[in-house]
Amino acid sequence: MAQEMTGNENIGKEELARRPIRSFVLRQGRLTHAQQRALDELMPVFGVPYAPVILDLDSLFGREGSPKVLEIGFGMGDSTAKIAQSQPECDFIGVEVHTPGVGSLLKQIGELQLNNLRIIQHDAVEVLQHMIADASLDGVHIFFPDPWHKKRHHKRRLIQAAFVKLLCSKMKAGAYLHVATDWQEYAEWVLDILQQEPLLENTAQSYAPKPDYRPLTKFENRGIKLGHGVWDIIFRRK
């Protein structure tokens, strides 16, 4: 299931290894009884403890050759569960730091009997650096990351040039990176950064149509009715 660290763990070392700035703030969320029960009963089965060793993803899911997709920051996990249910041929690794969201997704894993989904409750940058092998991912989902809309907080944004280079090192040739946001200025920021990465190419002229596999969230549906926009940005690894 795991092997000693190899490969390109030092991508963006100057900017990432000593990173005092994180893209998230841990908040003390309240757990429901159902979420706590799911954490107690299902985290030992579907959770992957953080450790600085490279995962053998085929062994982790018990099958070889299936496409592997990483989702960073899955929130309460509703979209994650729906995507995993609709694509049983793919295996999904969800990374999230907030305990209520982890409990919520575990609850859905149990209800839907999903065997193609695993959870790592840890900082995504450290997971990428120390647990994901180079050229091992077929896709990466980053849906509605915190836009940190105040200019003085832009340094906290997840999508930065060094982070994108790290992602590219973990993606296979032909793998896709899909970012979705409902904050237009952040969409422009993401598009600009991804366009500057020489290892990525845009699958559209600018923003992409929403793929069928990404479900509409309740929040997104409410925003659409109010005339708010959502921007999907999909690039492919060269």
From Swiss-Prot:
One Pfam match: Methyltransf_4
- Please give the superkingdom of this protein's source: Bacteria
Q: GO CC terms on record?
A: tRNA methyltransferase complex
Q: Does the keyword Lipoprotein apply?
A: no
Question: Which positions are annotated as binding S-adenosyl-L-methionine?
Answer: E71, E96, D123, D146
Which pathway features in its UniProt record? tRNA modification; N(7)-methylguanine-tRNA biosynthesis
The family database entries (CDD domains) matched by this protein are listed as: AdoMet_MTases (cd02440)
Return the InterPro entries for the record: SAM-dependent_MTases_sf, tRNA_(Gua-N-7)_MeTrfase_Trmb, tRNA_methyltr_TrmB_bact
Residues binding substrate: K150, D182, T217, K218, F219, E220
Report the top EC class in one word: transferase
- Keywords assigned by UniProt, alphabetized: Methyltransferase, S-adenosyl-L-methionine, Transferase, tRNA processing
Asked if the keyword DNA damage belongs to this entry, the reply reads no
Query: Which reactions is this enzyme annotated as catalysing?
Result: guanosine(46) in tRNA + S-adenosyl-L-methionine = N(7)-methylguanosine(46) in tRNA + S-adenosyl-L-homocysteine
Enzyme active site = D146
Enzyme Commission number, as recorded: 2.1.1.33
Q: Which GO terms describe its molecular function?
A: tRNA (guanine(46)-N7)-methyltransferase activity
- Family stated for the protein in its record: Belongs to the class I-like SAM-binding methyltransferase superfamily. TrmB family.
Spell out the NCBIfam families in the cross-references. Answer: tRNA (guanosine(46)-N7)-methyltransferase TrmB
What role does it play?
Answer: Catalyzes the formation of N(7)-methylguanine at position 46 (m7G46) in tRNA.
Instruction: Kindly provide the name given to this protein in its UniProt entry.
Output: tRNA (guanine-N(7)-)-methyltransferase
